[in-house]
């Protein structure tokens, strides 16, 4: 018997049977060893017997019994499983005769299974005949399975029932109730039906952005076929979704993938138009399985597509269609394009309403309608890099999952009581060991408190368990209704009118009445520990978590924080009232939801001399809004002085180094859409930079080098500049105000430097005034407070007299340079001498240092702090 003339599956089975013989210490490989392998899960042999109507588990037990009765041999040099038994040799000879009768080139598994029926006296054959399995019946099954084909390939078993192996029957899935309902998309489904009804080129390809519902359209068509809501020519059709991954996986040798695909196509062709093939991500067939000298999957499909023998629906995204399909013109022209557009917000709300029931049943929660509306509107506005309805469905799913997790977790109140109980029990155990009166008294009080707490914990636990049971009861009732509705659909499709009438007028109304009673009973309980409702607030929290943009309703603490934003900024930025007011007002407008949804939250141009707080205000705002001054996108425009550096903002163009990295501005905002963008020293940048900023200021959007639109609608744009600072320094009044004449002069210089279309798009141009003496004193107070804070860590208290502060202000401040020289002056005159005192040991921990003025010089006096 030539093993080379066997199919791969049979060769592998014999090799595995030898391993069984070795494990069981049997000298020969018998029929039972081989059948042990044939009956393994997912093996061709097991599936073959299952289709013949045999109880395979009982047959497997019979095979095990036969193996147990086989004699095992023990010894030092015994060779196990090296020979075939007389029975197995005889079986393979019978199988070879059958192979010649069937005119096969290779001996396949099903022929060996049939050959067993020839050995009438063998134990397993007798068992099969007792179970009603006959040679005639098995032969008929083989002929049906082969459909007139001969075995010409070593992988023949893989090609039987290829569609079942490598595809999913969508129509069957709908009948089994495994698919969510498809709402809308009627126009696209009609287009698909029309193209499928053509004589030739009857292959639609659905093209659209990821997440717009291309696969859903095919599922919608499957649902219509089940409901018989299609033209006559499609009523008896079935849709198979081809799994390209399963088709390619495990194809080890050249040509194996093509054989599998040919087997699938052969089955489709044999069905005479009854099977519609659906390939998701159809661009994968271009080049799939392509190796040197072999054809790719696309070329195997072309002849059948052209002749109309294959009904194929494809789905792919716009980018991949352009990249793969359009390159292969011959393949592209065999398809008819159906463009799937993103649904509107209104359509998305309808889709969500249709899916609501499925989500409620799956998660066991109650989803409010306002949550669905919020999911559609908020995802459309804030999640800009994905598409409806996918992103809205994700929000509802995520919010429902959050509530479900909370429902299954212990409520906070009960958790607190349980932890307190544990704490007191530990204390009780410790006090029991003490014998003094105070401890006994404390123990008595503690035991009293423990008794009360235990009672409270038990009642809360009972309430929680009851509420959970009530929620689960509602969830189970919803699932029952869903099952009954599915049964009703089945009954109507099969014209079982009596069953349909019982369900429609009896079972379903009864279940709905019971559900209503349960919901009303739940609604009466005012105080609830379990939150089971998904509202718009939960959706808003999910949006905030995904994007970092706060869209939840204002809570009390945040209201106070926003109303005090002005004061907080003033504490850090001293003297610039107009600028602080303008920025804080923009933030308040945005959180109240009143700002223009198509523009940034605010765009400001800060003008003024150096060192008066322009950049500091941006940092202060970042710290107040995001609790960290690093939480802002800071771009120093002095780095963008050359024309070619402009591309760094939006990314290098294709073909240039760094194309994959994206732009510094666009990438930062894409990852963090709610932020402050600070463009420092903007007048230093090349004029072309301002052209890039035009659409940011006007529409709140910017397209990067890869064509992705980055959303700037939730950013505060702050630009700083020193233009006209000399005029501001010279023209400021003693009171610290800027005369109108000086303001006009500065504006004229500004108009000369920036184009009108740039200035026209900025919300507010704010002039920062040079600092007055009072402002400078305030800044000195702030700087010395920071120094005092650093000294506190060394247990040194710092005090500075008003005269000393005035002297520092008069000597350290230069109007032309703003507050920055003050920092250097304080370092030189205060920090350095103080550091020397500490290092020399004259100032020790637990010391108070007072800085005062004497003979126009700062003097340091130190005294020990008395311990209280």
Curated annotation (Swiss-Prot):
Region (NBD1): 161-342
Name recorded for this polypeptide: Chaperone protein ClpB
GO molecular function, one term: ATP binding
Location within or outside the cell: Cytoplasm
Subunit structure: Homohexamer. The oligomerization is ATP-dependent.
Lineage: Bacteria, Bacillati, Bacillota, Bacilli, Lactobacillales
Clp R domain boundaries: 3-148
Swiss-Prot/TrEMBL domain comment: The Clp repeat (R) domain probably functions as a substrate-discriminating domain, recruiting aggregated proteins to the ClpB hexamer and/or stabilizing bound proteins. The NBD2 domain is responsible for oligomerization, whereas the NBD1 domain stabilizes the hexamer probably in an ATP-dependent manner. The movement of the coiled-coil domain is essential for ClpB ability to rescue proteins from an aggregated state, probably by pulling apart large aggregated proteins, which are bound between the coiled-coils motifs of adjacent ClpB subunits in the functional hexamer.
Residues in coiled coil: 393-526
Primary role: Part of a stress-induced multi-chaperone system, it is involved in the recovery of the cell from heat-induced damage, in cooperation with DnaK, DnaJ and GrpE. Acts before DnaK, in the processing of protein aggregates. Protein binding stimulates the ATPase activity; ATP hydrolysis unfolds the denatured protein aggregates, which probably helps expose new hydrophobic binding sites on the surface of ClpB-bound aggregates, contributing to the solubilization and refolding of denatured protein aggregates by DnaK.
Family per record: Belongs to the ClpA/ClpB family.
NCBIfam families: chaperone_ClpB
Domain of life, per lineage: Bacteria
